[in-house]
Amino acid sequence: METRASLRGVRLSAQKGRLVADLVRGKPVGQALNILAFCPKKGAGIVKKVLESAIANAEHNDGADIDELTVKTIYVEKGMVLKRFTARAKGRGNRIIKPTCHIYLTVGN
């Protein structure tokens, strides 16, 4: 049985999120949590929260054994982009792009 968890609108670029997602794809959840706990990237903490949510969903909703769960699928999609302006010299302005992403994770036996 498979259980899903998702987090949408995360203030992280999809490219940086995919770097972290590739670290835990296909791993047992205990090992994946250990990898994410010691990964220095910003996205690691975010993915860890999603993984913990998926584990809690599997345990509460499906009565799954945590020791048998693995990360079946994890993918990071591009979300909306926040566009901001910053002041520059001589009355000009530059655009600042603040990307977001959506993280989807599935755990199962």
Curated annotation (Swiss-Prot):
GO terms for biological process: translation. PROSITE patterns: RIBOSOMAL_L22. The keyword Ribosomal protein applies. GO terms for molecular function: rRNA binding; structural constituent of ribosome. This protein binds specifically to 23S rRNA; its binding is stimulated by other ribosomal proteins, e.g. L4, L17, and L20. It is important during the early stages of 50S assembly. It makes multiple contacts with different domains of the 23S rRNA in the assembled 50S subunit and ribosome. This is Large ribosomal subunit protein uL22. SUPFAM superfamilies: Ribosomal protein L22. The keyword Methyltransferase does not apply. GO terms for cellular component: cytosolic large ribosomal subunit. Part of the 50S ribosomal subunit. NCBIfam families: rplV_bact (TIGR01044). Keywords: Ribonucleoprotein, Ribosomal protein, RNA-binding, rRNA-binding. Belongs to the universal ribosomal protein uL22 family.
